[in-house]
């Protein structure tokens, strides 16, 4: 609850000052003389403004969210499990904000490079920042959901030793996070949704197995 409240407060506060951040972000587009930015309507501007505000709120409040989850679970954990999950949550709480920041920072550079390398002579190329924002947000949420899935599966493997019960629970988590991934992806990912969801399931399952062995093995032995 405190994390959600902090996210809301940060998003609301940031919305009043986000214009400067957006100007810096737009300035990161490396444009040639024959490439321009296009913003189609006031609605697009407000969409961009609030999208940035909400994303910034999530980045700021995510470590607090991880702390809240850990405190909720702490009373029912053994000492070895506490150390393992505390280390896992600590890593995750920094990976997601860093990953989202990198995705948002790199997208304008990549978009500018693509627009510069693939254009028709005599035709002015226009980059739509709204599409870049939508792609950035979708990519950020895909990364966030994937990382949370890895964290959830790793936690399940650490806490549940019974393979049959653990496998059943992990399948349910896969289905839940597959639905979240489907919703998180914008139309820019049309045609890739099934591939991304399947790849996320396979990679997250393998990665969670290795992480559970790593974190639990360190503190157990």
Functional labels for PLM-detected ranges:
Residues 1-221:
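Membrane topogenic/interface segments and analogous intrinsically disordered interaction regions
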